[in-house]
Structure formats: C-alpha cells, structure tokens
C-alpha cells in the first residue's frame, strides 16, 4: 500500500499561450510521517521519436509532509523552443507530471498537449518558420493516464517483494486455456471507456480530476504511439503515459514547505 496517494490534479491555466507557465493544483494524501521530502517534476516530451528532446521544465521539493490531505500549487516554466525539432513544435505531444520519494518514482500522470495556432488563417496556411507568439497550447486535462509504482518508503516492511511468490500449482494449469488470458482482459479494459477514462464529471472545474486508486496501473509505462486517433479526437500521436476523474477542494496541512529547487528552502503553505 502506498504511503502517499495522489487524489487530484487541476490544470489551472488551460488553454494558454505556448509561452505561458504551467500551473497545477495538486491534492494528495499522506498516511504516515515521512522522513524526507516529496520531489515533483514536470517533463515536456519534445519529440515522439526520441527522448533526447525531453525537457525537465521544473522540479519542486515539498516537505515536511503532515499526515492527512494536502494541497499545493506547482508552477513550471514553458519549454525551450530551441530544444524542440522545428517540425514538432505544432501538433500533439505529452507532458509528464511525476512524484518521487528518496529518488524513487511512485506516481506518474501524463497528459496529451495540442499545440496549434490561435487563428484559422495560420492554421490553414502555417508559415515556414513557426511563430511562437501565435501558438496556443491545450492540455487534454480530462484524459490523463496515471501509472503507479510500488516503492520502498521509510521502513523495510514497505518495500515491494524482490521476487514474485512461488506458485507450484501454476504448472498444473493447462497452458492452452490460460495463455494470453491476462492480455485479453487488459485489452478489454482499455477498450472500455468506463475503465480507460474520458468521462466528463459534472459540477467540476475545467481540467480537474480525481485519481482513483483502483484505476491506476501497478506496472510500468504505456506507449502513446499505440493510442487510437479517436482518443485524441483526431489530434495526432505522441509518447508518454496518460487516466480520468474530477477534483475535490480539500485544505492542506500548515507545516508543509515547498522548495522551487531540490537544494533550496521554499515557502510555507497555509492550511
């Protein structure tokens, strides 16, 4: 069981200009005292073909963490356009919001981002050289993809098992009956909109989601290049990990501090 659970993420300024800062309102719950801070990061995927163009937009140390439900604002700079291939400035890409404890990542939230010109004229007849000031970004906040990772927290008892438990009865199961059953079940859950997200939640602010524990994946990443065009509403392909929900307005503890750099002290947040 995770000591820290992500409850909700609200993309605050969306849509926005490409050059505007990213603002996220993040709500999470801490079940017990932690000895170290949480480190949040936002990464911009600059290319769908190579991670050499990935940019870490900002990182933030949050702590000490009071037990209970906490909320804070994460602000990150826009990407450096000089580090993005010119032919991939426009179109759909991905941003990844991650959190780690003691260098071990335990949750990742990915969003599709559509970058396009503000005017129909530029959309229909784009200039050879992109005009950055005229580009607008739109984060598909209602369709995030959430991935959880089991990690060791402060105690050895919290560490995930190094090896899977022995299953001697597994050899007695007929291979032809069981082979591929898990893969088929997983494909069925992905095809089900109720499982894969995408449902609008009435009465919630735009871009707000609630992260449900049973909707999170226990294993690694999801390749967005295999997502269908229907899920993007015709907006293209990209890489990353992206799931769905709504937000809750919950107060945070009064002892938590936020550092805008891993080696610096930050400001205290009020309850």
Swiss-Prot record:
GO term, biological process aspect, one: subtelomeric heterochromatin formation
Primary localization: nucleus
Annotated GO MF terms: acetyltransferase activator activity; histone binding
Keywords attached to this entry: Chaperone, Chromatin regulator, Nucleus, Transcription, Transcription regulation
Family under the similarity heading: Belongs to the ASF1 family.
Domain of life from the UniProt record: Eukaryota
Region (Disordered): 152-271
GO CC list: chromatin; chromosome, telomeric region; cytosol; H3 histone acetyltransferase complex; nucleus
Acidic residues composition-biased segments: 168-185, 211-258
Pfam families: ASF1_hist_chap
Role this protein plays: Histone chaperone that facilitates histone deposition and histone exchange and removal during nucleosome assembly and disassembly.
Complexes and interactors: Interacts with histone H3 and histone H4.
Organism, as annotated: Neurospora crassa (strain ATCC 24698 / 74-OR23-1A / CBS 708.71 / DSM 1257 / FGSC 987)
Cellular compartment(s): Nucleus
Protein name (Swiss-Prot/TrEMBL): Histone chaperone asf-1
